């Protein structure tokens, strides 16, 4: 559905770009049948979620304007905190056992102005979408947009030291073939 919002077209997802070097149809179909004005409002709302300082996914934004991401955070409640649990001091999702915590959701597309990718992230028992799912979506989206490891300046300044450490750790465990650009699969 996110790809449909991004393009205002009926989109059938495809997992394979080409077979034996022959590119397969893109999956983009007929117009969705929703007015451009309504789609523009939804897209703008998703852009604000990620790129406005008050947006729930602002901390997971992509810095480069030409690669700006639009998205929507979400939380799927697994169960209510009961009155008895509240009486025992359980007041937050984090206070519950892992298997009872809410699921974190985030959907996104990018670049905002000329969408090429759409994705959905679900982190089971991850809590809120902005804290658990949106950062994963941003990292996956950056990998897709850059065709590999993105530069640190693609990330918000406050995250760059942590991201640099994570990238260095990943380089240590990557298979040699992946480093040489060869696919292991």
For the regions a language model picked out, list residue spans one by one.
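Active-site beta-strand/loop architecture of penicillin-binding DD-peptidases
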Residues: 2-31, 37, 46, 50-151
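Gram-negative outer-membrane assembly/targeting C-terminal domains
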Residues: 145-185
């Amino acid at each position: 559905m996110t790809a449909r919002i991004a393009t205002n077209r009926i989109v059938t997802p495809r997992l394979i770009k080409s077979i034996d070097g022959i590119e397969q149809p893109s999956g983009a179909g007929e117009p969705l049948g929703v007015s451009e004005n309504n789609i523009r409002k939804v897209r703008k709302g998703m852009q604000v979620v990620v790129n406005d300082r008050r947006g729930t996914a602002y901390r997971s934004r992509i810095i480069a304007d030409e690669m700006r991401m639009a998205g929507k955070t979400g939380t799927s409640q697994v169960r209510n905190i009961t009155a008895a649990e509240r009486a025992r001091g359980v007041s937050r999702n984090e206070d519950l056992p892992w298997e009872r915590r809410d699921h974190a959701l985030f959907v996104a597309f990018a670049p905002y102005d000329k969408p090429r990718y759409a994705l959905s992230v679900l982190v089971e028992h991850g809590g809120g979408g902005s804290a658990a799912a949106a950062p994963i979506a941003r990292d996956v989206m950056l990998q897709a947009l850059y065709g590999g490891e993105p530069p640190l300046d693609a990330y918000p300044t406050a995250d760059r030291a942590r991201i640099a450490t994570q990238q260095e750790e990943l380089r240590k465990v990557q298979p040699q073939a992946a480093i040489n650009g060869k696919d292991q699969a």
